[in-house]
């Protein structure tokens, strides 16, 4: 599967190296802190998901859907490019340092949106938000992967993504309530000023680096899991993950399409529901139900992939996303739209942690963070593609046409994944036996 690594992590030293154990139970304290931190990371995005498209249309008077969705494109492009570098940098300098930088970049975001005199400021703030999400979310993912080892990788990623996206949903509801009480910007983003500050403080005071865990897993593997990428360096890993390896290619395209439809949902659903005559409270409930169900259900789907395998969940989840989006434009009424949002969340819950686990299965520990960074780059470029394509289609043919087009692309991706991806779950006789729960 994976290979001997071109980008070694910093070695652990002294007592840390001797005391390191892989497994969820052995690292429960640090793991729990990182789960909490990822909830703070998710809350940063949740502040925007209902209110920011409405800020664009109602406060800044943007008539073009493409212009409204430009904040998602800037977020996605920043997040994608920094994801690519974040993994490689983390393999060299350690995860904790990168996590701290991510929180520092998040501190100006709510302030810039609060005081923005033009939409350009909001777009610029989302460049910083993309960097914050890339660095912080990537590092919480990689540190959990490092700690638990292969045997509970799906469970670990399910817990991580569950915390993050449940927080997205809860923050979406809180932001809508604050917007109704104090204004579209003053309420949500005044509330959000403290989030990155608390996240940074918790990281500095409580988080330890996981270099020793990477070294321990590499030692337990006793060598490469599969033939190495032919040359060392980030450029080679980029090519290997993007197209040279058929399984990693399948994961990368599925990740891109997943976030393509998420970017569309983030930008278009609030406007679609607003034009249908729903109140801000009803819009918030439906738009929050999607990430909230996505987050909560990942508690089970990540662990399920450890037992059933990665491929069935990924293919089924992509197909369910496509069907849910098609249904969304066909039904009418708050209750039915809520049901389709929950179905979309279930589909995403099946896909999201499982794709990360599959990429982690395929990558050797010594270059795993770089491989995950490349995958996350492609996944988050989906925000750019989704925002721009959906915005252009909506401007030309209407929002229902844009949602339908994204649904069809998602179904095509499910078929491609079915045909290209092989099962990646390690066997109990291989690396999966090296860690204990």
Question: Can you describe what each PLM-predicted range is?
Answer:
Residues 97-111, 312-327:
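Structural signature of the two symmetry-related core transmembrane helices
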Residues 3-28, 209-251, 434-437:
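Juxtamembrane intracellular "pre-TM" segments in multi-pass secondary transporters
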Residues 25-76, 247-250, 254, 258-276:
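Helix-loop boundary and gating motifs at the non-cytosolic
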Residues 76-84, 169, 291-299, 383-384:
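Residue-level signature of mid-helix packing/kink "hotspots" within the transmembrane helices
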Residues 125-166, 357-358:
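Cytoplasmic helix-loop-helix junction between adjacent transmembrane helices
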Residues 56, 89-90, 177-182, 273-274, ...:
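Interfacial helix-cap and linker-helix signal at transmembrane-aqueous boundaries
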Residues 82-94, 297-309, 394:
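Helix-to-loop junctions at the C-terminal end of transmembrane segments
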């Amino acid at each position: 599967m994976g290979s001997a690594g071109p980008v070694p992590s910093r070695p652990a030293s002294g007592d840390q190296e001797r005391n390191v154990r892989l497994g969820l139970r052995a690292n429960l304290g640090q793991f729990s802190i990182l789960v909490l931190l990822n909830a703070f990371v998710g809350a940063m995005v949740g502040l925007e998901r209902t209110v920011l498209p409405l800020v664009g249309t109602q406060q800044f008077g943007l008539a073009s859907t493409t212009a409204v969705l430009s904040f998602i494109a800037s977020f996605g492009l920043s997040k994608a490019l920094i994801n690519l570098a974040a993994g490689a940098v983390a393999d060299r300098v350690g995860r904790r340092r990168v996590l701290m930088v991510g929180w520092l970049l998040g501190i100006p975001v709510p302030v810039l949106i609060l005081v923005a005199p033009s939409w350009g400021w909001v777009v610029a703030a989302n460049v910083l938000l993309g960097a914050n999400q890339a660095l912080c979310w990537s590092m919480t993912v990689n540190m959990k992967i490092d700690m638990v080892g292969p045997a509970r990788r799906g469970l670990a990623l399910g817990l991580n993504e569950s915390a993050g996206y449940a927080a997205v949903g809860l923050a979406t509801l809180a932001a809508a309530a604050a917007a109704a009480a104090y204004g579209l910007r003053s309420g949500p983003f005044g509330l959000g000023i403290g989030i990155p500050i608390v996240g940074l403080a918790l990281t500095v005071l409580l988080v330890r680096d996981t270099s020793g865990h990477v070294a321990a897993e590499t030692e337990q593997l006793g060598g490469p899991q599969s033939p190495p990428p032919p040359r060392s360096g980030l450029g080679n890993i980029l090519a290997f993950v993007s197209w040279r390896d058929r399984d990693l290619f399948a994961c990368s395209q599925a990740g891109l399409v997943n976030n393509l439809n998420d970017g569309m949902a983030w930008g278009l659903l609030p406007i679609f529901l607003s034009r249908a005559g729903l109140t801000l409270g009803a819009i918030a409930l439906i738009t929050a139900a999607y990430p909230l169900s996505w987050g909560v259900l990942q508690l089970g789907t990540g662990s399920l992939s450890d037992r059933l395998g990665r491929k069935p969940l990924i293919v089924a989840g992509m197909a369910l996303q496509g069907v849910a989006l098609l249904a969304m434009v066909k039904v009418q009424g708050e209750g039915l739209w809520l049901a389709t949002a929950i179905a979309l969340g279930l589909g995403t819950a099946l896909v999201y942690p499982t794709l990360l686990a599959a990429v982690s299965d395929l990558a050797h520990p010594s270059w795993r963070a770089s491989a995950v960074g490349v995958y996350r780059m492609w996944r988050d470029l989906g925000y750019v593609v989704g925002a721009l394509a959906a915005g252009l289609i909506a401007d030309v043919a209407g929002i229902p046409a844009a949602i339908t087009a994204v649904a069809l692309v998602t179904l095509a991706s499910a078929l491609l994944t079915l045909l290209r991806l092989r099962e990646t779950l390690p066997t109990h006789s291989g690396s999966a036996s090296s860690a204990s729960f």
